[in-house]
A protein has these predicted regions:
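Electrostatic interaction modules used in gene-expression and signaling proteins
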Residues: 163-165
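Beta-rich carbohydrate-recognition and catalytic domains
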Residues: 1-76, 85-153, 167-170, 174-198
Length: 198
C-alpha cells in the first residue's frame, strides 16, 4: 500500500448567511479578475463575485434565472449542478429543477398523491459576462425513468453530483431517488448544440 494522501483544503465559508441558500458552484477560473460562484437564493439561481473567496459583497450578487411559469419542468424551483464547462459558445451549465406531480388516488385514502419530479437541464451563459443567459432550452436533458430513480428515499429524483469532460465525452454522475449513484454520458458537442438550439 502507498503512503496516505493529504488533501490541502481552504474553507471559504458561506456566501450568504441566515437564509435558505444552497447549490453553490464555483466557476473553474476567474472572470474579469474575480472568482465567480452560483448559489441558490430560493427560488432563483444567483451569481456572486469575490476577489478573495472569503468575502462575497451583496452588491456583486445578482439573480441569473429562476423557475419558469405554467407547466415547465422547472416551474417550482431551480438550482445549479456541477462546475460550468467552458466552451467556445459560452459557459455550459447543468442545472436541476422540479415541479409538483400529482399521481392518481390511492386505495387507502382515496386522495391524490402529490410528489416532486426532479429533472436535469442545461443552460448556456455568456463567456465574458456569465450574468447574461445566451440560451435556456425549454425541455430537460434527463429525467427519472428507471425504477431506482423513481422509487427510493426521495422518489422521482435525478440530481447531478458532478460533471467530468474526458476528450469529447461528458460524464454526468447523479443521484437516483436520493439512494443510488448513476452515470449518464453524452458527447460534448451534442450537449452544446442542445444548449444553443434546444
Amino acid at each position: 500500500l502507498g503512503a496516505p494522501v493529504t488533501l490541502d483544503q481552504v474553507r471559504i465559508g458561506p456566501i450568504v448567511v441566515g437564509e435558505d441558500n444552497k447549490d453553490h458552484v464555483l466557476f473553474p477560473r476567474k472572470i474579469g479578475g474575480r472568482f465567480i460562484a452560483f448559489h441558490r437564493r430560493w427560488p432563483n439561481v444567483w451569481l456572486a463575485q469575490s476577489e478573495d473567496l472569503r468575502t462575497w459583497p451583496e452588491e456583486w450578487m445578482a439573480p441569473i434565472y429562476g423557475p419558469r411559469q405554467d407547466n415547465y419542468w422547472d416551474a417550482t424551483s431551480v438550482g445549479s449542478n456541477g462546475v460550468p464547462i467552458e466552451t467556445e459558445h459560452g459557459w455550459l451549465c447543468l442545472n436541476h429543477g422540479y415541479t409538483t406531480v400529482v399521481e392518481g388516488a390511492t386505495s387507502l385514502t382515496g386522495s391524490a398523491v402529490v410528489t416532486r419530479m426532479y429533472r436535469l437541464g442545461v443552460i448556456l451563459l455568456d463567456l465574458d459576462d456569465p450574468t447574461k443567459v445566451v440560451h435556456r432550452p425549454k425541455e430537460p436533458i434527463f429525467w427519472p425513468e428507471e425504477l431506482w430513480e423513481l422509487r427510493g428515499d426521495v422518489p422521482n429524483v435525478v440530481f447531478n453530483n458532478g460533471t467530468v469532460v474526458v476528450g469529447d465525452e461528458v460524464y454526468v454522475y447523479y443521484g437516483g431517488a436520493d439512494h443510488v449513484v448513476g452515470l449518464a454520458t453524452c458527447k460534448l458537442a451534442d450537449l452544446v448544440d442542445y444548449a444553443r438550439f434546444g
